[in-house]
């Protein structure tokens, strides 16, 4: 069970971290284009 929990946590991190990074880049580019 611990390995499954760690695997699930790792999968969530692998999915969330790039998503947050892309959102930050999108917000920066959109704010730059507006101004």
Swiss-Prot record:
Membrane topology for this entry? Single-pass membrane protein
Annotated Gene Ontology cellular component terms: photosystem II; plasma membrane-derived thylakoid membrane
One Pfam family from the record: PsbM
So where does this one cross the membrane?
7-27
Q: Name one GO biological process term.
A: photosynthesis, light reaction
Main location per UniProt?
membrane
The record's listing under InterPro entries reads: PSII_PsbM (IPR007826), PSII_PsbM_sf (IPR037269)
Protein origin, superkingdom: Bacteria
What UniProt keywords apply to this chain's record, in alphabetical order?
Answer: Membrane, Photosynthesis, Photosystem II, Reaction center, Thylakoid, Transmembrane, Transmembrane helix
Which family is annotated? Belongs to the PsbM family.
Role played: One of the components of the core complex of photosystem II (PSII). PSII is a light-driven water:plastoquinone oxidoreductase that uses light energy to abstract electrons from H(2)O, generating O(2) and a proton gradient subsequently used for ATP formation. It consists of a core antenna complex that captures photons, and an electron transfer chain that converts photonic excitation into a charge separation. This subunit is found at the monomer-monomer interface.
Listed name of the protein: Photosystem II reaction center protein M
Q: Which organism is it from?
A: Synechococcus sp. (strain JA-3-3Ab) (Cyanobacteria bacterium Yellowstone A-Prime)
This chain is encoded by the gene named: psbM
């Amino acid at each position: 069970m611990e390995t499954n929990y760690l695997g699930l946590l790792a999968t969530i991190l692998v999915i969330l971290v790039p998503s947050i990074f892309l959102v930050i880049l999108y917000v920066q580019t959109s704010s730059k284009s507006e101004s």
